[in-house]
Amino acid sequence: MDIANQLYMKLREEYKIDQKEFISSYICGKTRNVFATILATILSQNSTDKSALIAFSKLNETVGEITPDRIKHADINTIIDAIRVAGLGNSKARYIKNVAEVINDLDLNIEIDCQKLRDFLTAIEGIGDKTADVVLLTCFRCREFPIDTHIRRVISRLGFLGSSPKYKDISEYFKTRFSSEDLLNLHHLLIAHGRKTCKSRKPICDKCVIRDYCKYYLDNIKN
């Protein structure tokens, strides 16, 4: 069993995932609305999922329903005020308005070309690799593996891909080893581990279930 599968097994035993802690999965599962999921994921950029969910709910209350048409016709200052709690309101409001101009409702039930849709999404201002990959994996079960700050920190400390692996290197490593369903589960598990145990400051190494695979722990704590 390679290290990726060992990590997956250990983390599945340790954490129980609550979808409400992961805004993109929660919104896609609740609404079955790809456009709403894209907006929710944009709101989560450089923010916590908790704050992003508050902002999303406020935006939904403000415009009535999150659809491209409602967002297109909403005043940008109204959007800024509604999403303020998620931070970077001016930029995110502009991105949200821009997405509404470009995207009509995407149907979850149609077959899509994942790479073509990824190229389409990442060409839109405000949608980078991570945001696109989150939407593709969460809503369409495309075989993508989004990397956020928690996952990057955990993988960097583990060290099996080097001390500063690039987004593409981490993503490709896991994509070659897991199905889309397992990729989504592992994505959530690694984020949960980064939030609760492998924290940016003062990681709780003595409570870590994967410390025996961790270069940071073996080099700095155990010895």
Swiss-Prot record:
Its EC number is 4.2.99.18. Coiled coil: none annotated. It comes from the Archaea. Binds 1 [4Fe-4S] cluster. The keyword Isomerase does not apply. GO terms for molecular function: 4 iron, 4 sulfur cluster binding; class I DNA-(apurinic or apyrimidinic site) endonuclease activity; DNA N-glycosylase activity; endonuclease activity; metal ion binding. Its cofactor is [4Fe-4S] cluster. Gene3D superfamilies: Helix-hairpin-Helix base-excision DNA repair enzymes (C-terminal), Hypothetical protein, domain 2. It catalyses: 2'-deoxyribonucleotide-(2'-deoxyribose 5'-phosphate)-2'-deoxyribonucleotide-DNA = a 3'-end 2'-deoxyribonucleotide-(2,3-dehydro-2,3-deoxyribose 5'-phosphate)-DNA + a 5'-end 5'-phospho-2'-deoxyribonucleoside-DNA + H(+). This is Endonuclease III. It comes from Sulfolobus acidocaldarius (strain ATCC 33909 / DSM 639 / JCM 8929 / NBRC 15157 / NCIMB 11770).
